[in-house]
């Protein structure tokens, strides 16, 4: 099989490439250049998409004795990931750019080019598993990345390979060291690669500008003025521009955002409880949409826990009734529906959250 391996320069994709070589495949490595000005992406040993990462990926390819290329996807990345990220915050949403990158860049633009060039599959260093065409959680639950892959269609998954999903991260590092790969001890990346400072509010403010609005309490009383709804997300406690706790002495959190009026509503922790979720643009990873109701578990954050729920689908809307409330769920987040399975929880569907309601 002719396999293109997306090599980020990190330990996971490096071991993924090595395993593909060991399996006897015809392997080519590729690193994605995602910025026209690489200095705007994270530099140094921590992060991804930096010039240093490209060099690390090339050195691993040399050790593995495989061809290696750098492909420029900067324009697509800006349009489909960065611009989408900014626009989502303008709408008062909280997007996940890693989800969008997998959907639009790695498994669409990159995979599409790979197939056009005659490759049979795209392999990545994601912690996830595929069995019988079904996407499942990784063996290493702490590193599982099925959440950020749940937007992939059955057609996209048909050409995907996840070589390390059956192995704990600690063993991946040990294997890299045994293979003599210099990235064996390279730190993991955690933050958004195109915000090197880690200051999301400043990044958005520089692109959106000042759009003043009011911070109000549950009764509509104005408490403060802000410079744009893009500086807030549901559940946020710090940086609200208000003095002290609420009248009850308890902390106040962002409980609602109305981008049309520029209003940010704050309230108590209990106002963040959510019992019902609705999602748009559903994707059914097996290719078959379920009707419902389906007993399941739902995850609403990349590193969040699983919550018991009942899901149903009708007319392009995915609806979830929770058995117990989730706290601080925002529009724009991705919700992923899992079916519990001893062989590895199966991803049934995903959707972009459009509604999160209390009782």
UniProtKB/Swiss-Prot annotation:
Disulfide bonds join 101-193. GO terms for cellular component: cytoplasm. It is an enzyme of class 2 (transferase). One of its GO terms (biological process) is tRNA wobble position uridine thiolation. Belongs to the MnmA/TRMU family. InterPro entries: MnmA-like, MnmA-like_C, MnmA-like_central, MnmA-like_central_sf, Rossmann-like_a/b/a_fold. ATP binds at residues 6-13, 32, 125. Its main location: cytoplasm. Its EC number is 2.8.1.13. The active site is at residues 101, 193. One of its GO terms (molecular function) is tRNA binding. Catalyzes the 2-thiolation of uridine at the wobble position (U34) of tRNA, leading to the formation of s(2)U34. The record marks 126, 333 as: Interaction with tRNA. It catalyses: S-sulfanyl-L-cysteinyl-[protein] + uridine(34) in tRNA + AH2 + ATP = 2-thiouridine(34) in tRNA + L-cysteinyl-[protein] + A + AMP + diphosphate + H(+). It holds the Pfam family tRNA_Me_trans. Residues 143-145 are annotated as: Interaction with tRNA. This is tRNA-specific 2-thiouridylase MnmA. It is found in: Cytoplasm. It comes from Mycobacterium sp. (strain KMS). Keywords: ATP-binding, Cytoplasm, Disulfide bond, Nucleotide-binding, RNA-binding, Transferase, tRNA processing, tRNA-binding.
């Amino acid at each position: 099989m002719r396999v293109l391996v997306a090599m980020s320069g990190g330990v996971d994709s490096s071991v993924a490439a090595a395993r593909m070589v060991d399996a006897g495949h015809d392997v080519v490595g590729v690193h994605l250049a995602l910025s026209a000005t690489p200095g705007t992406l994270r530099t140094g040993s921590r992060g991804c998409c930096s010039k240093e990462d490209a060099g690390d990926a090339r050195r691993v390819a040399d050790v593995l004795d495989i061809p290696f290329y750098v492909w420029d996807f900067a324009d697509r990345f800006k349009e489909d990931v960065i611009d989408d990220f900014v626009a989502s915050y303008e709408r008062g949403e909280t997007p996940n750019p890693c989800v969008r990158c997998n959907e639009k860049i790695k498994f669409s633009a990159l995979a599409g080019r790979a197939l056009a060039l005659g490759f049979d599959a795209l392999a990545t260093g994601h912690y996830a598993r595929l069995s019988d065409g079904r996407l499942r959680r990784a063996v290493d639950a702490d590193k599982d990345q099925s959440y950020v892959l749940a937007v992939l269609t059955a057609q996209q998954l048909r050409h995907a390979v996840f070589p390390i999903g059956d192995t704990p991260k600690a063993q991946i590092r040990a294997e890299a060291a045994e293979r003599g790969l210099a990235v064996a001890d390279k730190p993991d990346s955690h933050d958004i690669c195109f915000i090197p400072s880690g200051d999301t509010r400043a990044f958005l403010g520089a692109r959106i500008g000042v759009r003043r609005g009011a911070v109000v309490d549950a009764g509509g009383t104005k408490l403060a003025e802000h410079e744009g709804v893009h500086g807030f997300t549901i559940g946020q406690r710090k940086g609200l521009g208000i003095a002290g706790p609420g009248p009850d002495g308890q902390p106040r959190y962002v409980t609602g955002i109305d981008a049309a009026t520029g209003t940010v509503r704050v309230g108590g922790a209990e106002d963040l409880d959510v019992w019902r979720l609705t999602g748009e643009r559903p994707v059914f990873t097996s290719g078959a949409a379920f009707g419902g109701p389906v007993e399941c578990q739902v995850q609403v954050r990349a590193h969040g826990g699983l919550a018991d729920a009942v899901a149903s689908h009708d007319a392009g809307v995915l609806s979830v009734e929770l058995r117990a409330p989730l706290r601080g769920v925002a529009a724009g987040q991705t919700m992923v529906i899992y079916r519990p399975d001893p062989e590895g929880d199966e991803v049934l569907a995903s959707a972009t959250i459009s509604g999160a309601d209390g009782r």
